């Protein structure tokens, strides 16, 4: 098997039609010797900010001298990004070798595992093989029935900002969504919650109490955000002052506060994480595709906000960083998202839209999205490819700012097309 064949095997397994649950993952991992039983975890769930928070946690733990696994989704440029150890992606040859090990075990099961379940098994094998001290494990979807939830009680469970997303799978209210996320809370294992949504906070507090899990809600009253520039945003939190965070979204200091709170919980459990490591980890964290500046002048931003809750945070960042400016938006949205609310947020900042369809069956066709924008009084033109869309948006932008957003699924293609355009 070569690398391409390994990826084809992983992606060939579709999750549609599978009944959610942990049985398949448990069966698969048992057949592989239960590699996850050798590992310690920080388990991260949430609607938005979970990837950024996970990246910050991993960066700080690495700065403290630990060997750190990081499991995230989706990938931006390359599949291997999803499974990292100390910032290094799993090598192609290791991925192929582990797929060759997982495939016979998966093929022998009567209820075939899903793509995400297979990737979770690959991650656990790699983290065990590389002898990680701790793994920062990002939930795929929800919490309770997510395949990452097979782990024993983690060192800490972290629940980031919650909002309305995946309502078909998780339920129509914030309480339903919080209930799914709170499924990662394990008996006696500490929980850190971003908080701020009373309906959701009540569910998390109740679940933590039922499971005798000590709960810490992030105290955002102790967060002071200073002026940011296009390279970093500077903030103080709970005795850590003047931290320059290279993730420049206005919302990122709040994610950092969540990470700091969780790291201090770990410290109270005996992990050696000095404040100097927290500072160093935050100041060198990298997390592509989240309010990422690809060019300073004229500005070209790439952002992965893919639901109304995330879009609201991105729009606030645009208002903070570029007051009074109109944008050319390069936009792709998944057809199952709240398109109405996302467009309502973007239209006041938009000079012009260029619409494209990300390379996934879930993407709304570019022409349909353009029609929806025009129906609301916006100016929009569809592009037949992402490459054509990037070129057109840059041309329309002139010396003004351009922002590509609406889904993480086109981030890699946008980055590639933009690099090609600027060769």
Regions found by a protein language model. Name each.
Residues 1-48, 52-67, 76-78, 93, ...:
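N-terminal leader/targeting and accessory segments in enzymes
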Residues 18, 22, 26-37, 63-152, ...:
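ATP-dependent carboxylate-amine ligase catalytic core
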Residues 38, 134-137, 145-158, 162-163, ...:
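Nucleotide phosphate-binding/pyrophosphate-handling subdomain across enzymes
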Residues 110, 118, 131-138, 154-239, ...:
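Acidic, Mg2+-coordinating active-site environments of NTP-dependent enzymes
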Residues 127-133, 269, 320-325, 393-401:
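Glycine-rich phosphate-binding loop signature in dinucleotide/nucleotide-binding domains
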Residues 183-191, 321-327, 349-354, 398:
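Short, surface-exposed connector motifs at secondary-structure boundaries
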Residues 194-216, 230-234, 299-302, 308, ...:
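C-terminal helical cap/extension that packs against the catalytic core
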Residues 407:
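Active-site-proximal loop/hinge segments that shape catalytic or ion-binding/gating pockets
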């Amino acid at each position: 098997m070569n690398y391409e064949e390994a990826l084809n095997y992983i992606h060939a397994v579709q999750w549609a039609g599978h009944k959610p649950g942990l049985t398949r993952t448990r069966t698969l991992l048992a057949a592989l010797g239960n590699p996850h039983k050798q590992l310690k975890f920080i388990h991260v769930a949430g609607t938005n900010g979970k990837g950024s928070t996970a990246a910050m946690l991993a960066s700080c733990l690495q700065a403290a001298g630990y060997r750190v696994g990081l499991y995230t989704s989706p990938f931006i440029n390359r599949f291997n990004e999803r499974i990292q150890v100390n910032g290094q992606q799993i090598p192609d040859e290791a991925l192929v070798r582990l797929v060759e090990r997982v495939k016979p075990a998966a093929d022998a099961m009567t209820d075939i595992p899903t793509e995400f379940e297979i990737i979770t098994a690959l991650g656990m094998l790699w983290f065990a093989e590389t002898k990680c001290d701790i793994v920062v494990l990002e939930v795929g979807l929800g919490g309770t029935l997510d395949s990452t939830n097979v782990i024993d009680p983690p060192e800490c469970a972290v629940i980031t900002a919650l909002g309305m997303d995946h309502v078909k799978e998780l339920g129509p209210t914030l309480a339903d969504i919080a209930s799914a996320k709170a499924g990662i809370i394990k008996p006696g294992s500490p929980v850190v919650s971003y908080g701020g949504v009373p309906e959701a906070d009540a569910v998390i507090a109740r679940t933590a109490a039922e499971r005798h899990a000590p709960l810490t809600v992030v105290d955002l009253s102790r967060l002071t955000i200073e002026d940011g520039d296009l390279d970093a945003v500077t903030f103080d939190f709970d005795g850590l002052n003047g931290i320059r965070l290279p993730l420049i979204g206005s919302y990122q200091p709040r994610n950092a506060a969540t990470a700091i709170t969780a790291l201090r919980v770990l410290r109270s459990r005996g992990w050696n994480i000095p404040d100097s490591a927290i500072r160093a980890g935050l100041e060198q964290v990298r997390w592509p595709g989240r309010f990422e500046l690809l060019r300073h002048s004229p500005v070209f931003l790439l952002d992965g906000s893919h639901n109304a809750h995330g879009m609201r945070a991105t729009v606030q960042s645009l208002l903070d960083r570029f007051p009074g400016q109109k944008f050319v938006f390069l936009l792709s949205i998944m057809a199952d998202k709240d398109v109405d609310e996302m467009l309502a947020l973007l239209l006041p900042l938009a000079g012009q839209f260029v619409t494209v369809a990300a390379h996934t069956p879930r993407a709304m066709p570019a022409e349909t999205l353009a029609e929806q924008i025009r129906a609301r009084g916006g100016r929009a033109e569809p592009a037949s490819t992402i490459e054509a869309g990037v070129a057109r948006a840059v041309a329309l932008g002139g010396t003004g700012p351009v922002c590509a957003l609406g889904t993480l699924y086109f981030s890699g293609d946008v980055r590639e097309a933009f690099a090609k355009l600027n060769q």
